[in-house]
């Protein structure tokens, strides 16, 4: 996968793109990442990328010309079809399903904004407008890092265990079940006996029940419209009954 990032602050990506999972993905040629400073595409001697909004108002807006030209340069170097993603508070909220959708693409380009916002004509370039959440950040760089991380870890060959990504919270539609490692007894806090039993069928049932319980208690909104097996539906009904008795 080719990932391009348009940003006024390319140095912000130096650390995150060369560490841990993403660093390994680059080293193993699973992905290639290029960061382009769209200030390099300005045409005035002061390298301005922003200007005052027509009609008045607070703040400065990113001008269309530098971003149009920067994107054209990126697409000339990497003509593979793909998505152009505008980081914007008014966009669709990013979640695991969006990450899974992005992971199917050959080429992703992230446009990271700054200042008050974008000249509206910039939106004509993009295929997706995406927000990290209902809060305001100084720029789109941190949001792009999160989206890239969530997307890249889904690509084949990135995670050491091929079962890791499908078992993560949100991938199944449920929060992840509790997990334990050695020692089996730490300061009186013991690993549940079922996990030490070696009975994989019972362990799977326990994990499903715990995932349902955790989701019901912490994120009940995730259960709305979720397709559950007959066994899971009965488990959830029992969990709700137990909760109502407390």
Curated annotation (Swiss-Prot):
GO terms for cellular component: cytosol. The keyword Transport does not apply. InterPro entries: Alpha/beta_knot_MTases, tRNA_m1G_MeTrfase_C_sf, tRNA_m1G_MeTrfase_TrmD, tRNA_m1G_MTases_N, tRNA_MeTrfase_TRMD/TRM10. GO terms for molecular function: tRNA (guanine(37)-N1)-methyltransferase activity. It catalyses: guanosine(37) in tRNA + S-adenosyl-L-methionine = N(1)-methylguanosine(37) in tRNA + S-adenosyl-L-homocysteine + H(+). The keyword Nucleotide-binding does not apply. Gene3D superfamilies: 3.40.1280.10, tRNA(m1g37)methyltransferase, domain 2. Belongs to the RNA methyltransferase TrmD family. Specifically methylates guanosine-37 in various tRNAs. HAMAP family: TrmD (MF_00605). This is tRNA (guanine-N(1)-)-methyltransferase.
């Amino acid at each position: 996968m080719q990932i391009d990032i348009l940003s006024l602050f390319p140095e912000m990506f130096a650390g995150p793109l060369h560490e841990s999972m993403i660093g390994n993905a680059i080293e193993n040629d699973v992905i290639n990442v290029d960061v382009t400073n769209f200030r390099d595409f300005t045409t005035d001697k002061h390298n301005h990328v922003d200007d005052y909004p027509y009609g008045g108002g607070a703040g400065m807006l990113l001008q269309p010309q530098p971003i149009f030209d920067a994107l054209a340069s990126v697409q000339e170097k990497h003509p593979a079809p793909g998505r152009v993603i505008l980081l914007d508070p008014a966009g669709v909220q990013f979640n695991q399903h969006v990450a899974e959708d992005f992971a199917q693409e050959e080429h992703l380009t992230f446009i990271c904004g700054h200042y008050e916002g974008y000249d509206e004509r910039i939106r004509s370039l993009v295929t997706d407008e995406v927000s990290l959440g209902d809060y305001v950040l100084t720029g789109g760089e941190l949001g792009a890092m999160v989206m890239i991380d969530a997307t890249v870890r889904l690509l084949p060959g990135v995670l050491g265990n091929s079962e890791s990504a499908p078992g993560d919270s949100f991938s199944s539609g449920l929060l992840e079940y509790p997990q334990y490692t050695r020692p089996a007894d730490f300061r009186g806090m013991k690993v549940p006996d079922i996990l030490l039993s070696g009975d994989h069928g019972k362990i799977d049932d326990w994990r499903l029940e715990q995932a349902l319980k955790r989701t019901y208690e912490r994120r009940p909104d995730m259960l709305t419209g979720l397709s559950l097996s007959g066994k899971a539906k009965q488990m959830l009904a029992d969990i709700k009954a137990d909760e109502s008795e407390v």
